[in-house]
């Protein structure tokens, strides 16, 4: 019986995407056609985030605008801050992130708008706030 149980996500298809692919013959993972290892070697984190969101690597001007927008979206709401402060001291960081992202989604002004433009804005806000929430949780937990 235990031989039939698959470990982890082996053989499990969660969904299909045009963003990333596993290329077994190259032993590589790709994002938008670029090997992840090459992106790690040659790009900043923000450049890769831009690539994932927009489908192409940014120009210097696009990257500057992207970074400025990300920085302007870092502020956490009082609700999220209070919830982080109330979390158990032994909370796992992934549980904190999951809870904070759920709260961000509930508070987001574009929650019900699923247009491509609104979805990119929602991702940008989550992208900006998540590391701040995690850092704050490490201080309080």
What does each model-identified segment do?
Residues 1-139:
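Hydrophobic alpha-helical bundle cores within soluble ligand-binding/oligomerization subdomains
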């Amino acid at each position: 019986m235990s031989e039939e149980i698959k470990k982890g996500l082996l053989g499990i298809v969660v969904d299909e995407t045009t963003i990333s692919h596993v290329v077994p013959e190259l032993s590589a993972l790709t994002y938008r056609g670029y090997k992840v290892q090459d992106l790690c070697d040659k790009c900043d984190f923000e450049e890769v985030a831009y690539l994932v969101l927009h489908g192409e690597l940014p120009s210097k001007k696009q990257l500057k605008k992207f970074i400025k927008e990300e920085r302007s979206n870092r502020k956490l709401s009082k609700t999220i801050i209070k919830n982080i402060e109330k979390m158990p001291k032994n909370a796992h960081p992934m549980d904190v992130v999951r809870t904070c992202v759920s709260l961000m989604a509930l508070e987001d002004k574009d929650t019900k708008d699923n247009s491509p433009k609104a979805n990119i804005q929602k991702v940008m806000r989550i992208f900006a706030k998540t590391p701040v929430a995690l850092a704050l949780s490490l201080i309080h937990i």
